[in-house]
């Protein structure tokens, strides 16, 4: 076993035990500061030399001193334990060496990162006299000697005597290191907690937008515009009034402009707006012709959809499962929402809401579309709420029937001259195959006017609406029928296709425009909305010439008459008004 690990001879002294310390640190730091080593000046014959060497963390092991005595008897190496004291925790005392070896030597190491040693000191005391080793030799050896990293059993056994003080020192260092780590971790946690914003506390009561009247929805992230209508505020009421919702917007600026427009409508040009008043000159002129509710409804329709519904129409929401559009109206059924149904398009749902609004709120209701679009009178008089299929039936029932201009009798009873209406013939088509008419399965509407006393032998007319009239108009020509005046027929009668269909005393006879006249075997005068097909075709001869009575007759907006002068054609007159 090599005991010359100090690098110089110890032969003058008898050595019974040798201690060797093993350090696992890769670097060695020597504090070379005057005054770091101390010895007892009161000792007469013994000199104790205190040499302080420091090693970096985590060991923090300090080899206190190597003492020797000038006496002849042998002495063991005294390895003084150390107690570590953090510079930040001066009040806490580390374990003392006298607790273990009964000595009074105490060494304080101020920091695990060894500094200049200005805040640390070594105090050594000995029982006997002796000389001190030269510090220069030890410093030179420590600088030149690498750290022994061999951790074998022999070194482990040799360092047993040092283990007590080393363990105490190491445990002290480890405890201080752990305490420092805990403190550092605590500071880090505190810093992270302080850096993390507390949403529930800091965001409470704070504005979510820099614009007036704009808030950011915390769930959807979209911006909503609203204003407070204080016109309905009661006396003594502490609230700001009624909140008017202006819609949801994707951009914060759009929501701010919606608020500005609504504020200008409610409070005039003297109100405070988010943007200059000069940017709203056109809108101010437009809003003069609208009420507050109508203008708010228009703002909602211009929005990018409500935050709680994906429709731009009032009272319309989209179902979250099947995606169909639902219509609801509020505050009509015991201050609750009334479900109006589910529709395929949002326009149909908006119409259902409008009908319900007109029914429950009258002419002052705010609707999605113009109120002239609906038959307001029929909706108000309807005993039930015409929504959906009922609304469609109501539209069909209230569809305006084409107006007719009646041919009236302007001839007085005393006048039997030929100046009055004698007879009339209608424009017809020649060379048209009648079988083509039966290929179109169209509906036949029978319009009639029972103005007076109709002859039972007169022909009855049925009219068919023909959508493909332009196919027949290509080969048409006008034919004036020359029907002689008969004495048995009064001058105020009207003849259609050679048949007398009316006599004196009736108010008139109407023929719808763009309809085809057919002779039918039977005709129900009370079947106004029934549909017919031609059942029988008849041909008759008239005194003026041969032409089919049941002909393809495209009655235009003109009718012609043949007067007594023979062959003279009077100016045309309107029989049917398309408007």
Swiss-Prot record:
It is found in: Nucleus. Gene3D superfamilies: AP2/ERF domain (3.30.730.10). Pfam families: AP2 (PF00847). GO terms for molecular function: DNA binding; DNA-binding transcription factor activity. Residues 149-177 are annotated as: Disordered. Residues 210-276, 312-370 bind DNA. Mostly expressed in developing seeds. GO terms for cellular component: nucleus. Residues 165-177 have a biased composition (Low complexity). PROSITE patterns: AP2_ERF. InterPro entries: AP2/ERF_dom, AP2/ERF_dom_sf, DNA-bd_dom_sf. Keywords: Developmental protein, DNA-binding, Nucleus, Repeat, Transcription, Transcription regulation. PANTHER family: AP2-LIKE ETHYLENE-RESPONSIVE TRANSCRIPTION FACTOR, AP2-LIKE ETHYLENE-RESPONSIVE TRANSCRIPTION FACTOR BBM. Transcription factor that promotes cell proliferation, differentiation and morphogenesis, especially during embryogenesis. This is AP2-like ethylene-responsive transcription factor BBM1. It comes from Brassica napus (Rape). The gene is BBM1.
């Amino acid at each position: 076993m090599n005991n010359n690990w100090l690098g110089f001879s110890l032969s003058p002294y008898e050595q019974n035990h040798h201690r060797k310390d093993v350090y696992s640190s890769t670097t060695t730091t020597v504090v070379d500061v005057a005054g770091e080593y101390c010895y007892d000046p009161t000792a007469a014959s013994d000199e104790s030399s205190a040499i302080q060497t420091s090693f970096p963390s985590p060991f923090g092991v300090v080899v206190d001193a190597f003492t020797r005595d000038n006496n002849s008897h042998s002495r063991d190496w005294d390895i003084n334990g150390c107690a570590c004291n953090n510079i930040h925790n001066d009040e806490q005392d580390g374990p003392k060496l006298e607790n273990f070896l009964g000595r009074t030597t105490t060494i304080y190491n101020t920091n695990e990162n060894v500094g200049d040693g200005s805040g640390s000191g070594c105090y050594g005391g000995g029982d006997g006299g002796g000389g001190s080793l030269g510090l220069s030799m030890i410093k030179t050896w420590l600088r030149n000697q690498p750290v022994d990293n061999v951790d074998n059993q022999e070194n482990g056994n040799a360092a047993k005597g040092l283990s007590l003080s080393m363990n105490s020192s190491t445990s002290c260092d480890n405890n201080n290191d752990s305490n420092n780590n805990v403190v550092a971790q605590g500071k880090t946690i505190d810093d992270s907690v302080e850096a993390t914003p507390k949403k529930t506390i800091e965001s409470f009561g704070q504005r979510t937008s820099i614009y007036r009247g704009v808030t950011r929805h915390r769930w959807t992230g979209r911006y909503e515009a609203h204003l407070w209508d204080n016109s309905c505020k009661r006396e003594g009421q502490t609230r700001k009034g009624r909140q008017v919702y202006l819609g949801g917007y994707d951009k914060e600026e759009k929501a701010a402009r919606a608020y500005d427009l609504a504020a200008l409508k409610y409070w005039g040009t003297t109100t405070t707006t988010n943007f200059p008043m000069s940017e709203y000159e056109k809108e101010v002129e437009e809003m003069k012709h609208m009420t507050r509710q109508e203008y708010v409804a228009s703002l909602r329709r211009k929005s990018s959809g409500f935050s709680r519904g994906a429709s731009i129409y009032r009272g319309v929401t989209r179902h979250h499962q099947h995606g169909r559009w639902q219509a609801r109206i509020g505050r009509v059924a015991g201050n609750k929402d009334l479900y109006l149904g589910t529709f395929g398009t949002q326009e149909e749902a908006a119409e259902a809401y409008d009908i319900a609004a007109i029914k429950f709120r009258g002419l002052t209701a705010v609707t999605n579309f113009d109120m002239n679009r609906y038959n307001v009178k029929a909706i108000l008089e309807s005993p039930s709420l015409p929504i959906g299929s009922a609304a469609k039936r109501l539209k069909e029932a209230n569809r305006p029937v084409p107006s007719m201009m009646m041919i009236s009798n302007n001839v007085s009873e005393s006048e039997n001259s030929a100046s009055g209406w004698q007879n009339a013939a209608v424009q017809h088509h020649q060379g048209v195959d009648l079988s083509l008419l039966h290929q179109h399965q169209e509906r036949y509407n029978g319009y009639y006017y029972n103005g007076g006393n109709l002859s039972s032998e007169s022909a009855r007319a049925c009219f068919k609406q023909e959508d493909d009239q332009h196919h027949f108009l290509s080969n048409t020509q006008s034919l004036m029928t020359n029907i002689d005046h008969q004495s048995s027929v009064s001058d105020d009668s009207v003849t259609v296709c050679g048949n007398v269909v009316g006599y004196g005393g009736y108010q008139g006879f109407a023929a719808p425009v763009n309809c085809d006249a057919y002779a039918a075997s039977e005709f129900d005068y009370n079947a106004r909305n029934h549909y017919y097909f031609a059942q029988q075709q008849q041909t008759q001869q008239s005194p003026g010439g041969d032409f089919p009575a049941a002909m393809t007759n495209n009655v235009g907006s003109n009718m012609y008459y043949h007067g007594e002068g023979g062959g003279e054609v009077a100016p045309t007159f309107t029989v049917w008004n398309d408007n």
